[in-house]
Amino acid sequence: MDTLDELYFKMLKKAVDGELELAPEGMDPRLIDCLTLPNDGTVVRVKPCLCPPDERHCAAACEWDALKPGNEVGIAVDTEKCVGCQACIDACELDSLKAKKDIIPVVQELHQYDGPVYALVAPAIAGQFGADVTMGKMRSTLKALGFTGMLEVAAFADILTLKEALEFDKNINSEGDFQLTSCCCPMWIAMIKKLYHQLLPNVPGSVSPMIAGGRTVKALHPKAKTVFIGPCLAKKAEKNEPDIAGAIDYVLTYQELRDLLSVTDLKPADMPEDAQPHASTTGITYAYAGGVAAAVKRTLEKLNPHRKIKLQTRKADGVPGCKAMINDILEGRRDGNFFEGMGCIGGCVGGPRAIIPKEEGKKCVQTYADSSAFETPMENPYVIGMLKELGFNTVEDFLTKSHLYDRQF
């Protein structure tokens, strides 16, 4: 019988070829579900767990108490608690836990759906498919795969930067006030919601750039399907959270996109340029730790250069680092008023489904960010024009009418 990886590539090739019957007869239904049911959890057990109860390293590695003894042999994953961080997958010594893949259903949509299908790529994509693969070449590649178009999520990071800068300017009025970000990291938000909920009043009610992108596309193109592409497994769980579900239909990782390219004849480096730059420097730098805080700080300086209480940033990356920073906040050792947390070491460039090392990824993102003609969203005509198309004609409108990008924690 095929292993999960063997089955995956066989089914992916059939999907690319347009075949309707993808799964061979007699395969374990858990393997089929892992490859074809993207909305039913993020981590699945594909074979029995034979570890003694006191040696279940997966459960010990889970920060969210999402792994429990199952009715069958082994472990059950609580999809309500799981945030898709991958810690349990890495800790499983029997290779029994796997992450779900969305790529096969996406390929089927590209063949069969009669409406537009948009790819929304996270800014950490810079360099992931080769140093010579520009954003324009990646756009051509995705269109050749069947996508209607490609949008940079960094543009929606620009929108959230503006929103968070406005909220900081409105809400931080004394030396004791402080604000927590980053809305872009589902692990950071999950940590606050599940473990440190007393800090929720200090979290701006903003969706992530991924959700902002999906909502914007669907506001402008109601029949569109949206596919996020990034280095993060936790985004697969985020898209299914009840209060924001529906904005993003599928989440692919860079590794899934690489797998798709491996069964086609497409080579991104050889594709023609289709350059449509629409993100600022600060939006692109969301991809690495410290980028969000720096973006909001620089934008606030342009919004209100004479502000008495300046934005003072502090950042942490990795779950232990984020926990340490939160404990400092709770114990009064703040050393700042704007706190950024990223669940992965290095930020998104260090995500579990990145293709290149995080240090190389950061350099590629910095190079791409430096090439932008716009430093912040304040100068970005693409973002300003999009906001006007959505009905935001002034800065004040965006502060008071930004329901499209709001989230209630």
Predicted regions and their residues:
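Alpha-helix N-cap/helix-initiation motif
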Residues: 51, 81, 202-206
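Iron-sulfur-associated redox domains of electron-transfer enzymes in respiratory
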Residues: 2-15, 19-27, 100-409
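N-terminal-biased segments
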Residues: 13-22, 33-48, 86-102
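Short, intrinsically disordered, charge-biased short linear motifs at domain edges
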Residues: 37, 46-50, 67-71, 78-79, ...
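Generic low-polarity alpha-helical segments
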Residues: 1, 47, 55-58, 75, ...
